Amino acid sequence: MDRSMVKGPLYKQFDLERKSARQAEARLSLRLQRLEIICLYHVKSLAREQRQLQKELQRLQQDIIKKRFSSYVGHEIQKRSKDVVTFLPPTGQRHAVPEPKIRTLKNSVTQEVKTKIPVPSLHDPVLKDTLRSQEHLLSHGERTSCFKEGSPQGQEGEPTNPLKGVDPSKDVSVPCHDQELSTNKTEDSGVSSQDGERGSAPANETRSENASQKPRGDADVQNSPSSVDYAGSFKDERTKPSFLELFEKAKNAHYVRHRVPPESERLLSIGEIFGHKHYSLPRTGETL
């Protein structure tokens, strides 16, 4: 009896201890889970903060690089500006580099050239001869140009009536306005040159004697190959037939006809018209 009485309360005590141990384990497991959740949250927050810190670090590094680059560029610009701008040591005032005085140099050079090069006198006979030869060549060139321009205009228009008082067998060239002006200019220049020669003859006797000893320049101008070729081409153009000659020849030309009239222009008889082969016209005085 005593043993059974003793075993009963012991078993109850063991059961209570087991229950309490199980409850403690459950509480510990719950706390453990909570701690794990808290640990994960802290780890995630730390990772987020680490990313933010890395971004800020990159931004700061870029700002530092930009500042260094801007400071370097500003330093280089200052160096270049110092090289360009000079400073006066006593006063410290800035002054720009003096530019070259181009205009003054040009004026001085032109004045020196004018003083060194002698201007030829207008009464020099050599100069007068050269001017005459040049005017002669210019007048010839204007005549040939007018002749060339007048020929195609005549071919396009083809005038049927020739000009009054003009021989068609001779060469005809219509004068241009420029040609008339050039001829008037040459005449005026010839008159003025003659007057100048008469007035300056006693003053330029010594010059003419010196010029007679030296070779004259107008001979070179007149005998130059360009003037000879130009005169040759002008002669060749003058030998060509004019437009009026060709027009007269074409107007007087007749078309050559065949001696025998063609079959299309032959007169047919009545028998050939009505299909009778052996049919002849009745003679005078006969009846059909």
Swiss-Prot record:
Residues 16-69 form a coiled coil. Residues 177-188 have a biased composition (Basic and acidic residues). Residues 203-213 have a biased composition (Polar residues). Residues 141-235 are annotated as: Disordered. Keywords: Coiled coil. It comes from the Eukaryota. PANTHER family: COILED-COIL DOMAIN-CONTAINING PROTEIN 190. This is Coiled-coil domain-containing protein 190. It comes from Mus musculus (Mouse).
